[in-house]
């Protein structure tokens, strides 16, 4: 009975707020998940509703989610998302807002390995790299660049729409507003099919495009074209990271928001209503035991899918019931290996002559996707990248944990191996339809957008959309939701 008392008090307070009228801001908001999506949506919700709204962020693990680091030999290295595209405008804004800095870039050459030899090798000379691309693949690389730039030019419209307060209740509506039926169709056709239509050769797709997609998604050119285009855009632009670790963005946003971080596993969301106003009871469990609280708005900022064994979140009291999100996720294993590279495996018996810091792979060898000589999250002015003959920290990305024999294939010897296993991205093609952000009146699924494309910036875009959607719904500003022909509307407003 003692435990029920604070719940009854909270419910009474929320009912009083609900009775105060439509102009009153929400009293309490719950966010489930403290990754980049959850921390960003907490920031955006406070930005729109004001500082008086209480925001509780539930996190069962570590703040940062798929932005994480691992300590190796007294240095910290990225084990999750390692870098961001220069056009990641929300992430750029977060870094400026929080007073963080870009990490100093340490240049290294890249190559694509095909199992027996290198398919493509980067040099230190830009014009020579272009000549090699032309010599091997004709103008396919130019056609690819034009295709990606066209997609990105349309996608960048989302920032203008969001700046004017527009939001979308479903992923399909958002995509249609940016690229009309073209973007929606790109979620149903493969990268390979789309590139062949614009004149990119099959050889270029097999040798280069597939390697980039394996590096970013762990998937092939059979994945949907829209997600593939977003991945290929990241490969073409300049990349950056956060000094001290990318996860500082998440912790910084939560601190700035003064969100109440509750370390617990959310088990259910139950609908209650009074006088036509929805209230949501969030039940959770932690080391202390089981408890629950009531909220005006709930945002789910963690993946919901049937094969996610770590998520047992259920929904009760909804009519019609909220369906499980269909589809599977692509497992990715990141292994940080402190050791000596076996350069002979890559055709360089003398390790001193091995010139590459980043190795991408085609479909073969299948046991790893990328191999990178990585730098710590804190880089001093005197820092230099380890030479191939020296013991270095290598990041190996693979679809499964590496066996000892596979580690021995890649490394002559090693001091330590530390791993992080992620349900990193949706397994594209495993879901027949695109999910919706709005699950109920004020219940939202932020991660819906990653079924169109998955990246840190995409999650930030989804966070802004959900915050605007919640705000516009709360104040019944329906003219700002799911509007068509937004380019014309925005130009008119300007």
From Swiss-Prot:
Location of the protein in the cell: Secreted
Species in which this protein is naturally found: Homo sapiens
UniProt name for this protein: Prenylcysteine oxidase 1-like
Protein encoded by which gene: PCYOX1L
Residues bearing carbohydrate: 342
Functional description taken from the UniProt entry: Likely to have oxidoreductase activity. Required in the mevalonate pathway to regulate prenylation and enhances the bactericidal activity of neutrophils.
Signal peptide stretch: 1-22
GO MF annotation terms: prenylcysteine oxidase activity
GO cellular component, one term: platelet alpha granule lumen
Enzyme class: oxidoreductase
UniProt GO BP: neutrophil-mediated killing of bacterium; prenylated protein catabolic process; prenylcysteine catabolic process
């Amino acid at each position: 009975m003692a435990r029920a008392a604070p719940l009854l008090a909270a419910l009474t307070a929320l009912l009083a707020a609900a009775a105060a009228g439509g102009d009153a801001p929400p009293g309490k908001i719950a966010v489930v998940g403290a990754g980049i999506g959850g921390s960003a949506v907490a920031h955006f919700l406070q930005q729109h509703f004001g500082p008086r709204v209480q925001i509780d962020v539930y996190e069962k693990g570590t703040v940062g989610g798929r932005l994480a680091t691992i300590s190796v030999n007294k240095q910290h290295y990225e084990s999750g998302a390692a870098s961001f595209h220069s056009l990641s405008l929300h992430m750029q804004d977060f870094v400026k807002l929080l007073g963080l800095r870009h990490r100093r870039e340490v240049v290294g050459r890249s190559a694509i390995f095909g199992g027996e030899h290198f398919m493509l090798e980067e040099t230190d000379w830009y014009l020579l790299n272009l000549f090699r691309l032309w010599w091997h693949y004709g103008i396919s690389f130019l056609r690819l660049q034009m295709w990606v730039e066209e997609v990105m030019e349309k996608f960048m419209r989302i920032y203008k729409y969001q700046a004017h307060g527009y939001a979308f209740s479903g992923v399909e509506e958002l995509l249609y507003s940016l690229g009309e039926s073209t973007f929606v169709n790109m979620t149903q056709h493969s990268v390979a099919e789309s590139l062949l239509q614009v004149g990119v050769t099959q050889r270029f797709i097999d040798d280069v495009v597939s390697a980039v997609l394996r590096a970013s998604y762990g998937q092939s050119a059979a994945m949907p074209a829209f997600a593939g285009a977003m991945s290929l855009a990241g490969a073409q632009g300049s990349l950056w990271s956060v000094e001290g670790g990318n996860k500082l963005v998440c912790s910084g946003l939560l601190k700035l928001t003064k969100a109440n971080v509750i370390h617990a596993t959310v088990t259910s969301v139950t609908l209650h209503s009074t006088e036509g106003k929805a209230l949501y009871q969030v039940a959770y469990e932690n080391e202390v035991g089981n408890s629950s609280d009531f909220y005006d708005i709930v945002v789910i900022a963690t993946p919901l899918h049937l094969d996610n064994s770590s998520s047992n979140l259920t929904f009760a009291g909804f009519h019609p019931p909220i369906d499980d999100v269909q589809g599977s996720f692509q497992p990715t294993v990141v292994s940080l290996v402190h050791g000596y590279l076996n350069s002979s495996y890559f055709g360089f018996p003398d390790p001193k002559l091995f010139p590459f810091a980043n190795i991408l792979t085609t479909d073969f060898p299948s046991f790893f996707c990328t191999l990178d000589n990585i730098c710590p999250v804190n880089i001093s002015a005197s820092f230099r990248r380890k030479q191939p003959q020296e013991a270095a920290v290598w990041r190996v990305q693979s679809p499964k944990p590496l066996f000892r024999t596979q580690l021995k294939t890649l490394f002559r010897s090693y001091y330590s191996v530390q791993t992080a296993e992620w349900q990193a991205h949706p397994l594209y093609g495993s879901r027949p339809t695109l999910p919706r952000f709005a699950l109920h009146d004020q219940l939202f699924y932020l991660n819906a957008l990653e079924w169109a494309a998955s990246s840190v910036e995409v999650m930030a875009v989804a966070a802004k959309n959900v915050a605007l959607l919640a705000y516009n719904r709360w104040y019944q500003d329906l003219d700002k939701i799911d509007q068509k022909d937004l380019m014309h509307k925005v130009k008119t407003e300007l």
